[in-house]
Regions:
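Adenosine-phosphate binding glycine-rich loop
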Residues: 10-15, 229-340
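Glycine-rich Rossmann-fold phosphate-binding loop(s) that bind the pyrophosphate
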Residues: 137-138
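NAD(P)-binding Rossmann-fold cofactor-contacting core
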Residues: 151-175
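Short acidic low-complexity segments
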Residues: 179-194, 209-210
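Short glycine-/small-residue-rich Rossmann-like dinucleotide-binding loops
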Residues: 201-203, 225-226
Length: 340
């Protein structure tokens, strides 16, 4: 069984290349969204606890693999020097149930979120989109810029965060990327003139991070911060103006921007699930005046894609630690022999 630690993952990314990994991950996501109906999936179960939420994200392809991810969201963790989001995941065979890989998924979650947003943006944003407004410059912000840079010729990033130190960090990390960086005093200033608006905030509340009056015709919005009940980022009146795409309606209705609508309203408003854009049955955009919205909550299929890709690369480069999470015994009915 492969064990992918942070150190192992860094070696894989250094060996393969960060941008190439994101490109291949986008292709893996396309492949897996393209066979959407073959997966057994469910909205993730969650437990709301003091300070945050704990979630499990299982999925099965009904052919080869089953994966799950454990993930949290504790917005106040940075105050004690800890990550807002941490995650681990497992890839298992479905024919025997045996695990093949156990992996860190804090970094993998950021990578798959970036690749998934880039995929949706490629299908929904105007081709001439060059200016990105980024609201929230926390742990996922740099990954988002790197992903979007693959699918659009981003020339300028206008960014804002309520934490000035987070903006300092973002500017330092992005200084050499070859894109004009514009530090803004508030979200309205950042959004002004943007072609793409990406929100990646952590506040566990219904907050109008983006106001309706700021949103102009032709803009594409990636609303990525909504990932649990009671956590949204857009003024509700924005939604009826948009062509709204979600990943998985059953989960988005619980956790996404559309959670504030009743079921009938949400069904009427949502134009498509992302797989329908991937397979070409629906178009992400039909003209340059449309406002498009990717109401993303993050789903288990994305974790499946990133775990499968990482497993293949770990085998290819013989990286990752080998370990036993199951007993190695000659008689499978003699479990106690492992202890004798």
């Amino acid at each position: 069984m492969k064990i992918i630690t942070i150190e192992s993952l860094i070696k894989i990314l250094n060996k393969y290349g960060f941008d190439q990994y994101l490109l291949d991950l986008m292709q893996a996501l396309k492949r897996d969204y393209g066979r959407w109906q073959s997966f057994t999936k469910m909205p993730r179960p969650s437990m709301h606890v003091p300070g945050g939420v704990l979630e499990l994200m299982p999925i099965c392809d009904n052919a080869t693999y089953y994966t799950f991810k454990y993930v949290n969201c504790h917005p106040k963790n940075p105050l004690i020097g800890q990550q807002t989001v941490v995650a681990t995941g497992q890839l298992s065979r479905i024919d025997t149930g045996y695990p093949l890989m156990f992996s860190e998924m804090t970094i993998l979650t950021a990578l798959r979120t970036a690749a998934n947003a880039a995929l949706a943006t490629d299908l929904m944003a105007r081709k001439d989109s060059h200016i990105l407004a980024l609201i929230g410059t926390g742990a996922q912000s740099e990954f988002q810029v790197k992903g979007l840079k693959i699918v659009r010729d981003i020339k300028e990033v206008r960014y804002f965060d309520i934490d000035s130190k987070a903006m300092d960090k973002f500017e330092k990390n992005m200084r050499s990327i070859g894109i004009k960086l514009v530090r803004c005093h508030d979200a309205e200033e950042a959004v002004n003139g943007a072609d793409i608006i990406t929100t990646v905030t952590a506040c566990k509340a219904n907050v109008d991070v983006i106001k309706n009056k700021w949103v102009k015709a032709g803009v594409h919005i990636n609303a990525l911060g909504g990932d649990t009940v009671g956590k949204t980022e857009l003024e509700l009146s924005i939604l009826p103006r948009c062509r709204v795409v979600v990943e998985y309606f059953d989960q988005s209705f619980i956790e996404g921007e559309i959670q504030r609508l009743n079921h009938e309203e949400a069904k009427k408003l949502v134009y498509a699930e992302l797989y329908e854009l991937v397979n070409g049955s629906k178009k992400g955009r039909t003209n340059d005046q449309e406002i498009t919205l990717f109401d993303s909550v993050g789903i288990a299929l994305e974790d499946y894609s990133v775990l499968c890709l990482t497993y293949e690369l770990a085998k290819k480069y013989n990286l990752g630690e080998d370990g036993n999470f199951t007993p190695l015994i000659s008689d499978p009915k003699n479990l106690i022999s492992a202890l004798l």
